[in-house]
Amino acid sequence: NRLEPAFLQLAKLFSHTVVFFTQPAEVQSMAFSNFCPAITVECGRPGEVNGITHALNFLQHCLKLSEIPTQPVTAEEIALFHTVATVKVPDTIEISFGTATGDLCLINELDQLNFQEIPAGTPFGRVCSDHLNHLEVWSESGQDVGDNFFTIQGGRLQTSKPVMPSMLTKDIEIIRQDCLCYLMERLEHT
């Protein structure tokens, strides 16, 4: 939530990939960041053993610290990204994965693009009906920037610029309640 060295040092203990975000503002780390270095960690789906183990190792490491380092973090130590947009699918659009049914037919392996830097032209799926001619992508300022990130050519939905999706899910309920994913871009730091 902040780019000061102590925050980045704490994030570095959890992962080489660090994401700076300002929305949603209601996360606990935002409140704590007014008092001390605080981060939000992404551990995967609830109950996944790898995520639980990773979080436990991080907490054990933090408990062994006498203090959080405050020296600047170099670009070699972390890959810093900024969340720039949220991809939403309207409730009126029927979604499917790996099939040609529904309005938006997403590739079956979509969740494998999670936290991967992908180039322009990466396929996300196909538009399988006339009900969808534009994917809703909302910037942090509330602007629809879908055309900046995705194109539909011959029914094929693909990225129009390099980007890193995060929190990609194939869970339709989560897509409806929250979003399909967030989009991130690399953030240069010194």
What are the residue ranges of the model-derived segments?
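Structured catalytic-domain cores with a bias toward divalent-metal coordination
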Residues: 1-190
